[in-house]
From Swiss-Prot:
Keyword check for Secreted: yes
Residue pairs linked by disulfide bridges in the UniProt entry: 75-90, 82-95, 89-110
One Gene Ontology cellular component: extracellular region
Domain description: The presence of a 'disulfide through disulfide knot' structurally defines this protein as a knottin.
Top-level taxonomy: Eukaryota, Metazoa, Ecdysozoa, Arthropoda, Chelicerata
Protein name per UniProt: U11-theraphotoxin-Hhn1a
GO molecular function: sodium channel inhibitor activity; toxin activity
């Protein structure tokens, strides 16, 4: 009976020690995989961040070009004298010689088209 107990105890101790070794090995393996996964995630995150910054810069550049091109510079309103050679009338207006009123000024004025 004693030999059975000793044998059982020996097998039990051996099983527990092997199980502990397997757990440690598995834990180390999982830790390595996690670290590798983090490095891959960091790389992917940096790559995505660079692409987003490039897109943002491109969009801001296009917006600034649009606003620069669409914005009207200082212009002359309707009924205001303008220069025939350099008309700065606002959009929808043209620099014309006045008919009837204002002929005595010998100047051009901005009128609607």
């Amino acid at each position: 009976m004693n030999t059975v107990r000793v044998t059982f105890l020996l097998v039990f101790v051996l099983a527990v020690s092997l199980e502990q070794a397997d757990k440690d090995e598995n834990r180390m393996e999982m830790q390595e995989k996690t670290e590798q996964g983090k490095s891959y995630l960091d790389f992917a995150e940096n790559l995505l961040l660079q692409k987003l910054e490039e897109l943002k810069a491109k969009l801001l550049e296009e917006d600034s070009e649009k606003s620069r091109n669409s914005r009207q510079k200082r212009c002359i309103g309707e009924g205001v004298p303008c220069d025939e050679n350099d008309p700065r009338c606002c959009s929808g207006l043209v620099c014309l010689k006045p008919t009837l009123h204002g002929i005595w000024y010998k100047s051009y004025y901005c009128y609607k088209k």
